[in-house]
């Protein structure tokens, strides 16, 4: 039910917003905004690096955040990568995986989409690591998360179109893609 409800919301709201954003925003600006949202996620990545005892990654993440938040103008530019500090991604679902927690059942969460039980729990914990959760008011957070949602949905326009045009069953294709994508992320 949530899969098709999310699909309807995507078709009626999120995809048109993402297409409008793509049409109105030059590609370099779209990339800059994507980098800025990536930068805002670095405190979450840092916390999970520490929990996974990956101290070199944690030092890199902290350095990237400091450099890109200042010299990179709030993350619009990835100055840290130019200095050799390459980005990586991690979350609390990956932290749980590192401690041996299995996937659990496949879920489709309202608005958040497909995930597993482990990663759904990770979403909740990651929100506690996110400074936006405790530094911003609810309306500012909603505006910021909505903006990030549009930016992220724009990045997926072509992939989603390909999937919906070529899959026999959208539900099964998304489920398989979710597990494949997550498996790739877990083994990096």
What do these predicted ranges mean?
Residues 1-11, 15:
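Mature N-terminal segment immediately following signal peptide/propeptide cleavage
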Residues 8, 46-50, 177:
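Amphipathic, soluble alpha-helical interaction motifs
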Residues 12-28:
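Membrane interface segments of multi-pass transport proteins and intramembrane proteases
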Residues 31:
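A small/polar active-site loop signature that marks catalytic segments
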Residues 35-117:
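Mid-length scaffold segments of soluble, non-membrane domains
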Residues 94, 99-188:
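A structured, mid-to-C-terminal "fold-capping" secondary-structure block
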